[in-house]
């Protein structure tokens, strides 16, 4: 009997060379879903018919090898061999025999053959589709594999994967920001919390939860230079590499909005053709499943102007050619291919307009680089690890610039400048602090490569470039035609020179249109336009384009008058750059480098403008004080800033970012005439609770005006997210502003390092801080030595709140060293909830007997216990003790400590306020206190006994106290189960003429209607008595 291998070889021998090659090709690509193993090409290349049969059986066994051959005969259209092999199929087992006999009937063979041809046809179509996708992915991979640096020479490029550094992304609803160019406000506090809300790229289009609708539109928002375009290109590359959206989208099309916004009509099919590797893409087949397509639109804000004119026009036909902005508008509004997905990048300026076009979009904010990613970027940029380490160390030392490097564009500029310095062998000097300084340095490095351009010609080119930039800013224009260049004295050949310098680049796909390589460069040169002058017949004038009279009429005064009026703030960065450029050292540097004349008149105009704005009332179109501070900070010239800050009678700003802290610190330390200073978190609201009602906390916000000087002396920075690294510059203002006497830093994570910086400032002779609040500042015992040094060296500090900091007993021991010092003049001290135990009470007791200035001590919410209070009471009986108010709220006390407190009430006539809320004293404890309260030397005015486990058994003692104690004015008894009879009895006592109580707080009690009526009757009969009660039924 002939073996299966020989039979199979005989069939293969009937194949001619062409068919045998086809057979091998199908054998290599055999569908895996059929359960057989494809034979590798390398083992089939030189195999003859016998070798091939052997390989098929070795890989899959006889039965599967035969089935593979039968299927491939059909695939290569050899029906004769297919029918013969079907009829000649060996008997494998009973099941197969039965099956074989059934399918070998002539009718069955015919039906099976036709069905198999249909299946193979469908397989062919799918394979063609896969071939299209595979070819397009290869094209996208090739197109987006590399990027060009802005300063790259011809032919130079950088591998995108090796340079790309991960950006932080968070889901966020769009905010109604009025300013487009607030680059520095992107690094805000939530950036530190972003791991909790960060979004992974692969989840961009996933629903929020299992019940939500899928997401079809995603909007990436971020300021200029934050990395929107590079992220969009990375998404394209990762998709092409099969790393992203592999099973979600068959096609991703990258659209440059500024290119599509041109007036040339085009259809959606034309857009796809422009993305395809050859001129004949299968558009119909691509658009057959729009849900498998993602359009990635980069730079929506760059076509905003065009949208204004044609927002109502719609295109629904993918073959119809329309204006580019109408085409994109139709895609965005889901009028064209409504089932397709969109990913749009934009600056915040265009968010409001974009929002009206979208239906349920997901907004994702790009926050830039985290601190760790900044370091990663440096090490990726510099191929030499030693250079990377040196550059990163330098930037880290300049904290302001390191902060700015969260913006990828700034990071690139800084790295470029440092690398050029390294390559020339120059030592790395202290890097500049501001955006202007970074751009000036970058421009100077570009000028080194200006080639053979003559000096006077270059000056003309630069002037034309600056006027072009300014004209574009005023008209909100970023794409320029050749006629625009000619209007500003520039020729096509001139632009080539700038292309070599990478300041002004020619568009690759739009040959007749030109743009600045980045919007911020256009803003920088627009600011320079207002500074460049030339000598004309003995007079210095500002030079401008001959055909642009409108721009000549828009001088610095007009620029500043319009600053703040533009709804979207297009002039903000231009004015900031203007301030930065008039720095005298920078002006001299530019005049030398550019061989040009810089206007000095602009400095006077800017100072006059600041003076007017500093005194102006708050109006919607007025720039905020913080924005003015940003302008002054950009200048980095302290004499000018001091002159400007003299015009601010009142400073009231909200801080929300790190740069806000840095900028405000720089300006405030140069401010010597301010009368009111108020700094706060944007969402901060004042806490208006009484000090006594708090039973141990000062106000979180204080606005105190001394009547003799009429100068506000309060500064509050509550919940400003200050950290220790931002404190040094801010605290330096404490030594220069002598009118500042109150400082509230509550709810800021200063930590011990920040506290150390603050203590250095507090010990400065020029510092006049008297009241300092540091609640919830993340302090530990390690800072207590520094605080103790302040207490022992400064007699000005009279009030200190350290509540809600884990100082511990050891921290209090260190603190008490300063409190016992002869120079310590502290009067009020809050140590509420500081992780204290009875072990600290001995140290505090020694303070009470030696410090004669301390009159208020609040140490509640600590586990002091009865033993701790007993130790304190021993020293409070000392005649030298001047303590007036003691807060022991929720301190784990029982009736055991009440005898010691009674002794204090009997002996210390200075003692007037005692807070015992939330301690289980019980009726026994009150009975013991009653003895002290009835003593003739007792001068207590305020007694707080809320939630102290009192019952109706305390009624007689309470009545006795109210009747015989003539000093007590306020009594709190809330949240005690006194009962109706006791309360009614107290009402009768309070009606007596000898009772001098002014305030009775009963809080929440279970009282009946009769008791309520008794309280109301008492209130009417004795209006000078305030009764606060809340009845629970």
From Swiss-Prot:
Cystine connections: 6-104
Protein name: NACHT, LRR and PYD domains-containing protein 3
GO biological process: acute inflammatory response; cellular response to lipopolysaccharide; cellular response to peptidoglycan; defense response to Gram-positive bacterium; defense response to virus; detection of biotic stimulus; inflammatory response; innate immune response
Disruption phenotype: Knockout mice are fertile and appear healthy when housed in a standard specific pathogen-free environment. They do not exhibit any increase in serum IL1B after administration of R837 (an analog to guanosine and TLR7 agonist) and/or LPS. When challenged with LPS, mutant mice are partially resistant to endotoxic shock. Mutant mice display impaired contact hypersensitivity, a T-cell-mediated cellular immune response to repeated epicutaneous exposure to contact allergens, such as trinitrophenylchloride.
Result of altering residue 1029 to A: In LRR6 mutant; does not affect ability to form homooligomeric double-ring cages that hide pyrin domains to avoid premature activation
Short motif KFERQ-like motif 4, span: 988-992
Induction details: By activators of Toll-like receptors, such as lipoteichoic acid (LTA) (TLR2), polyinosine-polycytidylic acid (poly(I:C), a synthetic analog of dsRNA) (TLR3) and bacterial lipopolysaccharides (LPS) (TLR4). Up-regulated by IL2 via STAT5 signaling. Slightly up-regulated in osteoblasts after exposure to invasive, but not invasion-defective, strains of Salmonella typhimurium (at protein level).
Tissue: Expressed with high levels in peripheral blood leukocytes, including Th2 lymphocytes and macrophages. Expressed at low levels in resting osteoblasts (at protein level).
Domain topic, free-text comment: The pyrin domain (also called DAPIN domain or PYD) is involved in PYCARD/ASC-binding. The FISNA domain is a critical mediator of NLRP3 conformational during NLRP3 activation. It becomes ordered in its key regions during activation to stabilize the active NACHT conformation and mediate most interactions in the NLRP3 disk.
Region (Required for binding to phosphatidylinositol 4-phosphate (PtdIns4P)), start-end ranges: 127-130
Phenotype upon changing residue 291 to A: Abolished phosphorylation by PKD/PRKD1, leading to prevent NLRP3 inflammasome activation
GO cellular component, one term: mitochondrion
Annotated residues for binding of ATP: 165, 222-230, 518
Pfam families: FISNA, LRR_6, NACHT, NLRC4_HD2, NOD2_WH, PYRIN
SUPFAM superfamilies reported in the protein's UniProt record: DEATH domain (SSF47986), P-loop containing nucleoside triphosphate hydrolases (SSF52540), RNI-like (SSF52047)
Subcellular location(s) per record: Cytoplasm, Cytosol; Inflammasome; Cytoplasm, Cytoskeleton, Microtubule organizing center; Golgi apparatus membrane
Motif KFERQ-like motif 1 mapped to chain: 351-355
Span of domain NACHT: 216-532
Molecular-function GO term, any one: phosphatidylinositol-4-phosphate binding
Result of altering residue 803 to D: Mimics phosphorylation state; impaired ability to recruit NEK7, leding to decreased activation of the NLRP3 inflammasome
Enzyme class: hydrolase
Cross-link (Glycyl lysine isopeptide (Lys-Gly) (interchain with G-Cter in ubiquitin)): 320, 426, 687, 875, 970
């Amino acid at each position: 009997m002939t073996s299966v291998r020989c039979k199979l070889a005989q069939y293969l021998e009937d194949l001619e060379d062409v068919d045998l090659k086809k057979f091998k090709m199908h054998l290599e690509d055999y569908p895996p879903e059929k359960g057989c193993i494809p034979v590798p090409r390398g083992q089939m290349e030189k195999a003859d018919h016998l070798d091939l049969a052997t390989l098929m059986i070795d890989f899959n066994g006889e039965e599967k090898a035969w089935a593979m051959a039968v299927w491939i005969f059909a695939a290569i259209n050899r029906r004769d061999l297919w029918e013969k092999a079907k009829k000649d199929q060996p008997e494998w087992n009973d099941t197969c025999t039965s099956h074989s006999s059934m399918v070998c009937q002539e009718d069955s063979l015919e039906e099976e053959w036709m069905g198999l041809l249909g299946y193979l046809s469908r397989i062919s179509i799918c394979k063609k589709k896969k071939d299209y996708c595979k070819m397009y992915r290869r094209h996208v991979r090739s197109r987006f594999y590399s990027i060009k640096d802005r300063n790259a020479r011809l032919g130079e490029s950088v591998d995108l994967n090796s340079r790309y550094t991960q950006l932080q992304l968070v889901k966020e609803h769009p905010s109604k920001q009025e300013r487009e160019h607030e680059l520095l406000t992107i690094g805000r506090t939530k950036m530190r919390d972003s791991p909790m809300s960060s979004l992974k790229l692969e989840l961009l289009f996933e629903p929020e939860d299992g019940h939500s609708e899928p997401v079809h539109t995603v909007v990436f928002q971020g300021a200029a230079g934050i990395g929107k375009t590079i992220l969009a290109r990375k998404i394209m590359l990762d998709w092409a590499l099969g790393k992203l959206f592999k099973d979600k989208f068959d096609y991703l099309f990258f659209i440059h909005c500024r290119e599509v916004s041109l007036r040339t009509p085009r259809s959606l099919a034309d857009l796809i053709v422009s993305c395809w590797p050859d001129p004949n893409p299968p558009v119909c087949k691509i658009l057959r499943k729009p849900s498998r397509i993602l359009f990635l639109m980069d730079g929506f804000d760059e076509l905003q102007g065009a949208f204004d004119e044609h927002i109502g026009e719609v295109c629904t036909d993918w073959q119809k050619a329309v204006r580019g902005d109408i085409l994109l508008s139709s895609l965005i509004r889901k009028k064209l291919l409504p089932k397709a997905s969109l990913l749009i990048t934009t600056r915040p300026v265009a968010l409001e307009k974009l929002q009206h076009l979208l239906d349920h979009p997901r907004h994702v904010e790009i926050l830039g680089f985290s601190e760790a990613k900044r370091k990663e970027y440096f090490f990726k940029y510099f191929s030499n690890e030693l250079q990377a380490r040196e550059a990163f160390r330098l930037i880290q030392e300049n904290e302001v610039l390191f902060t700015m490097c969260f913006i990828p564009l700034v990071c690139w500029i800084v790295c470029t400048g440092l690398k050029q310095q390294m390559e020339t062998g120059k030592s790395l000097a202290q890097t500049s602090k501001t955006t202007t300084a970074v751009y000036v340095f970058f421009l100077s490095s570009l000028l080194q490569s200006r080639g053979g351009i003559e000096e006077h010609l270059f000056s003309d080119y630069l002037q034309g470039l600056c006027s072009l930039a300014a004209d574009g800013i005023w008209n909100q224009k970023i794409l320029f035609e050749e006629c625009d260049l000619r209007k500003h004295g520039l020729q096509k050949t001139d632009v080539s020179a700038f292309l070599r310098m990478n300041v002004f680049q020619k568009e690759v796909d739009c040959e007749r249109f030109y743009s600045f390589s980045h919007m911020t460069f256009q803003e920088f040169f627009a600011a320079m336009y207002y500074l460049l002058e030339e000598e004309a017949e003995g007079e210095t004038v500002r030079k401008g384009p001959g055909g642009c009279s409108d721009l000549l009429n828009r001088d610095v005064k007009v620029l500043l008058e319009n600053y703040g009026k533009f709804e979207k703030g297009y002039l903000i960065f231009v004015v900031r750059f203007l301030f930065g450029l008039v720095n005298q050292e920078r002006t001299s540097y530019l005049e030398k480098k550019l061989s040009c004349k810089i206007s000095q008149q602009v400095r006077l105009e800017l100072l006059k403008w600041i003076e007017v704005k500093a005194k102006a009332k708050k109006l919607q179109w007025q720039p905020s004080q913080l924005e003015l501070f940003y302008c002054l900070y950009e200048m980095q010239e302290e004499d000018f800033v001091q002159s400007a800050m003299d015009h601010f009678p009142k400073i009231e700003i909200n801080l929300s970012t790190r740069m806000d802290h840095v900028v405000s610190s720089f300006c405030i330390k140069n401010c010597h005439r301010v009368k009111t200073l108020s700094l706060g978190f944007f969402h901060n609201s004042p806490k208006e609770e009484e000090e006594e009602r708090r039973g141990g906390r000062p106000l979180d916000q204080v606005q105190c005006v001394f009547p003799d000087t009429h100068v506000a002396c309060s500064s509050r920075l509550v919940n400003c997210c200050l950290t220790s690294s931002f404190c040094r510059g801010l605290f330096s203002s404490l030594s220069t502003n002598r009118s500042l006497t109150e400082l509230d830093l509550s709810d800021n994570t200063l930590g011990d390092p920040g506290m150390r910086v603050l203590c250095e400032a507090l010990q400065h002779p020029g510092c006049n801080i008297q009241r300092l609040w540091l609640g919830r500042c993340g302090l530990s015992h390690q800072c207590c030595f520094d605080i103790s040094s302040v207490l022992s060296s400064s007699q000005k500090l009279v009030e200190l709140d350290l509540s809600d900091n884990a100082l511990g007993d050891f921290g209090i021991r260190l603190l008490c060293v300063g409190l016992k010092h002869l120079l310590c003049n502290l009067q009020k001290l809050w140590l509420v909830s500081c992780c204290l135990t009875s072990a600290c009470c001995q140290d505090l007791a020694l303070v009470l007997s030696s410090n004669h200035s301390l009159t208020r001590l609040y140490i509640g919410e600590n586990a002091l216990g009865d033993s701790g209070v007993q130790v304190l009471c021993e020293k409070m009986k000392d005649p030298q003790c001047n303590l007036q108010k003691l807060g022991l709220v929720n301190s784990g006390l029982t009736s055991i400590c009440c005898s010691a407190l009674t002794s204090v009430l009997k002996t210390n006539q200075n003692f007037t306020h005692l807070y015992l809320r939330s301690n289980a004293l019980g009726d026994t404890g009150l009975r013991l206190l009653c003895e002290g309260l009835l003593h003739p030397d007792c001068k207590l005015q305020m007694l707080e006994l809320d939630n102290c486990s009192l019952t109706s058994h305390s009624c007689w003692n309470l009545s006795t106290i109210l009747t015989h104690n003539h000093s007590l004015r306020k009594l709190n008894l809330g949240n005690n189960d006194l009962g109706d009879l006791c309360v009614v009895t107290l009402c009768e006592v309070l009606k007596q003429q000898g009772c001098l109580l002014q305030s009775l707080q009963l809080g929440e009690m279970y009282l009946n209607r009769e008791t309520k009526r008794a309280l109301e009757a008492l209130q009417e009969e004795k209006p000078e008595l305030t009764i606060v009660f809340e009845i629970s039924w």
